[in-house]
């Protein structure tokens, strides 16, 4: 497993990091986002949407109550929030339907089991309110794609 780390000093940095990763994403990529409330998971997904050329990326919101939102871009984006769900409920969302045609971003992913082709995104906040964003990638070839993208604002 390869780890790629980023530091975000403000929300716009988190969006930019997500955008860079979105530019290198392909249909079937699954991002499992973990972090406390307010850590920046939804800001990261806004960036993914921007990188996937979703026209209304600024309007991406956490699907806390709808549970699953989809967006059209050069590649579709399926945004899921599992905060309010228990394990058995997750299978009923139909996330598998999007795995061939979209990038899937799952907030509160620690609440379920997942597929092999996943990237874990952990966001932690330090005392200075900086976000440490760690992308864990199983496939070394995929890790190279994101390492080669310049994510410096």
Question: Locations of the language-model features?
Answer:
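Short phosphate-coordinating micro-motif centered on Lys-Gly-acidic
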Residues: 4, 88, 96-153
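P-loop (Walker A) phosphate-binding loop of NTP-binding proteins
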Residues: 36
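Post-Walker A helix-loop "phosphate-sensing" segment adjacent to the P-loop in P-loop NTPases
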Residues: 50-59, 73
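Phosphate-binding P-loop
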Residues: 22-27
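Conserved nucleotide-sensing/catalytic segment adjacent to the nucleotide-binding pocket
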Residues: 60, 64, 68-110
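Conserved lysine of the Walker
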Residues: 41
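Hydrophobic anchor at the beta1->P-loop junction of P-loop NTPases
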Residues: 31-33
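N-terminal pre-Walker A segment at the start of P-loop NTPase domains
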Residues: 1-20
């Amino acid at each position: 497993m390869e780890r790629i780390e980023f530091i975000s000093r403000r929300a716009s940095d988190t969006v930019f990091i997500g955008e860079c990763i979105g530019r290198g994403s392909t249909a079937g990529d699954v991002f499992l986002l973990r972090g406390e409330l307010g850590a920046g998971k939804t800001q990261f997904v806004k960036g993914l949407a921007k990188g996937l050329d979703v026209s209304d990326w600024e309007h991406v919101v956490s699907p806390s109550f709808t549970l699953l939102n989809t967006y059209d871009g050069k590649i579709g984006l399926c945004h899921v929030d599992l905060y309010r769900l228990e394990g058995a409920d997750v299978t009923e969302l139909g996330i598998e339907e999007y795995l061939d045609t979209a990038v899937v971003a799952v907030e509160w992913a620690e609440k379920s089991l997942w597929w092999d082709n996943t990237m874990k995104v952990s966001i932690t906040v330090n005392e200075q309110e900086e976000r440490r964003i760690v992308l864990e990638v199983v496939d070394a070839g995929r890790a190279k794609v994101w390492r080669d993208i310049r994510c410096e604002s």
